[in-house]
């Protein structure tokens, strides 16, 4: 995705799929992102700056590639992410929900 999106719902990335945010790309700042199945990847490495989403969910075998970008989890509900988070960027948890990270990062 290379454009700013205006939908406010959640985003699901199916197993084996990759959603890559490019220059100027964005997702809803409160929409949940679910990595649903082995090999599902959220790739922020090509984005031009920090990204904010809602809750992050996914099991082992899924991944988030930050590159050098920061990811803010602005959750209003509780979520669990069991996949791997890689890259040199950072992760910030904001909002009123609890985000649990159970994978090796």
Predicted regions and their residues:
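Surface-exposed loop/turn positions within long extracellular repeat scaffolds
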Residues: 1-61, 79-88, 99-105
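Primary detection of the long, small/polar-rich alpha-helical "axial" segments characteristic
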Residues: 91-97
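Extracellular/surface-exposed low-complexity segments
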Residues: 66-80, 86-87
């Amino acid at each position: 995705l290379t454009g700013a999106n205006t939908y406010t719902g959640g985003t699901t990335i199916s197993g084996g799929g990759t959603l890559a945010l490019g220059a100027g790309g964005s997702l809803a700042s409160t929409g949940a992102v679910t990595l649903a199945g082995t090999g599902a990847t959220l790739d922020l490495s090509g984005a031009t700056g920090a990204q904010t989403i809602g809750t992050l969910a996914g099991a082992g075998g899924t991944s988030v590639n930050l590159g050098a970008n920061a990811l803010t989890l602005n959750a209003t509900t509780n979520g669990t992410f069991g996949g791997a988070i890689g890259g040199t960027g950072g992760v910030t948890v904001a909002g009123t929900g609890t985000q649990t990270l159970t994978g090796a990062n």
